Amino acid sequence: VYKTLFGQSLLTHLANADEFNNLEDYVEHVTSNNFIDELPHSYWANILPQFKQSFEANLLSLKEEGLPTKRSEQFNFANIHKLYAIDILSSESDHDSYDVIERFSYLNGLSKAIVLNDSRVFTSNDLGKRSPFNIQILDSVNTNKHRQSEYVKLLKQQDNFSKVTYALTPFPNVIIFPNGSNDTFNKKPVTVQYRNSSDEPILQCNTTIFDVQYNAKVHLKEDVKTTAGQMNYSMYVLRENAELTIERTTNDYGGWNIFDSVFICHPGSKLTVKFTNTGSQYTQENFYIDSSSKTSVDIIGRNEIYKGNQYHQYVYQKSNDPDNYSCIDIRNVGKEYASTSFIGRYDVGPLSTDFDGTMNNQNLMLDKNVTMHTRPVLDIHTKEIKCQHGCTVSNVNEDHMYYLQSKGVDRITASEMLVESFLC
């Protein structure tokens, strides 16, 4: 982490090139009295007072509640102690580094592409142009005091890692898909890459609001590549009758990753998320969905967790209005010494009549040393619904393995075929 919203540098007294800290050290610093007392004197406090209010409220909440623990339902099975034991390399700011700009210069040869790096937004040339119904970006360079002050009010404190991510984010960004764009960004999807600017074990954070305005149809291809520590807090606002499709791929390149995704679904909106993940030394991927009336939500995950990697997930959907549809279908495959967990919760209020929900989580262990947990939680307060769930953990079917080997298929290839069949 190089900067926070209201601090020019973080842990500057520990910013030696060869010194390491952990996540608790960073949280302790940004919630210290000295840090909070300096907020009124910061640059952005005068320009965007609402930012200061939101940021300070987040810090005070973080100071009171601290980092998430296993006592919280969503982290009951997560090996959260492994996350807190990760060493993070202290580093001075690279915010204006030519090397960083050069690292992402490949965008010049792409179209409909965005890179998010430590709250910086880099775009391909076509998205950087001002034209009717093009994407609008509000960041520390392209500012609009009134609009940004309204958007930042959406960043409310939640019982997860989003508070930490926001506290360590240099600047919260907003990416707007205007209603007049219709299905322009659906026919030609937008690629959103989450990247580290270094392969060193530093930590970089992004807090981003994606606003899909009414009647707009948007397709995002999200590519998360973790070469170092990365924390992402992304909020997706689906306005009335908006449609959003996300295809997210997360690959391990030696780092670790926390990704909190919050979806605010207005009436008549449609959300589809398809994702894959390999896990990492620690990965936490959470989805929080707040559904208004007549919404449709599909969350489909197919994850192959690599040897020794950690992958933990919490999916929460809240429905307080009628006629909502939901399908959560997540399958995990764990290789040797992998550790995974899934906790899914439906919270259906008394006014959410005709809710139609299906929650499935299937897990396949490829080795006896794999650890996999799964738990569905249904909190239903109305009888006028249709809801079903199924969560399982199983081993490779030896009968299927024997059959394939009897046909001349070697054991490794047979295992790969069974995994591919499981994840299809």
Which role does the model predict for each range below?
Residues 70, 411-413:
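A local structural micro-motif
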Residues 11, 34, 271, 297-298, ...:
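Serine/proline-rich low-complexity intrinsically disordered segments, especially terminal tails, linkers
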Residues 134, 138, 143-409, 420-424:
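Conserved beta-strand/loop scaffold segments within soluble protein domains that form the structured core
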Residues 62, 414-415:
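Small-residue helix-packing motif on alpha-helices
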